[in-house]
Amino acid sequence: QYEKIGLIPAAGKGERLGFPFPKELYPVIEHNNYKPVSHYILENIVQADVDHIAIVINETKHQLIKYFGNGSRHNCHISYVVQELREDDLTNTKTPGLAEAMDTPYHLTKGKIVYFGMADTIIMPVNFFKIASQQLTSDIDVILCMFHTDRPEKAGMVQLNDDNIVKRIDDKPETTQLEWMWGAVIWKPIFTDFFHDCIHNKQITDYANIFNEAISSGIKFKGVGFEDGKYLDMGTYNDVLRLSQWLKK
């Protein structure tokens, strides 16, 4: 029986939206209550009886720490892990990618079952992690929580066999017949270590490539689809507009 930990990457600069605050704190007003968008994925993780969550931030994200604090107000313990900028040369700093953010808290995630979700997403039902975790049986190493999308060109689309075992991930395909995208992930320590090895020893820093390498190496992925589930992310102004329209419904 492994310990559980949540993992929420929130280290990106979020420059596309140009908000004067971290996009993870974009205000969602529901039933006359304010909740930042990142509160939703935290709730999803806590619903699955996970009481320790690692949030990956960059050195400018003080407001996230101010909002979430140590987690006690949100029924969990929160550890903040700072992902530092890589200096490629003296004049140009590049933000490390998502895969590197997923690996940054390795010292906290190794040896545990990881519940991973993005800080700028709203996913329904609220207990989807709890439901999906029931499929994490002894012969399955990774669970992909899957949702329908009308924009596969922005998503990681999932190829399945008849038993919902994942054959590969097609990342952001221009055209596809695939029905499901992955929106959040649960994984066992075997995948944490594989992921860490890809980043540090194999120089593979694209998460879709790492997923596919893992599948090829025999790590067993299973898809759990939420037929009536909802997945909304906040990558662009169009997404913000969709979120507003969805909340009105």
Question: How should each PLM-predicted stretch be described?
Answer:
Residues 115, 133, 165-249:
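Catalytic-core segments of class I nucleotidyltransferases/pyrophosphorylases
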Residues 42-43, 61-64, 69, 125-137, ...:
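Short alpha-helix within the catalytic core of nucleotide-sugar-dependent glycosyltransferases
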Residues 73-162:
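Conserved beta-loop-beta/alpha segment of the NTase-like Rossmann-fold superfamily
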Residues 37-41, 97-104, 210:
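Well-ordered alpha-helical segments embedded in enzymatic catalytic cores
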Residues 58, 81-83, 145, 169, ...:
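Conserved beta-strand termini and adjacent loop/short-helix elements that scaffold enzyme active sites
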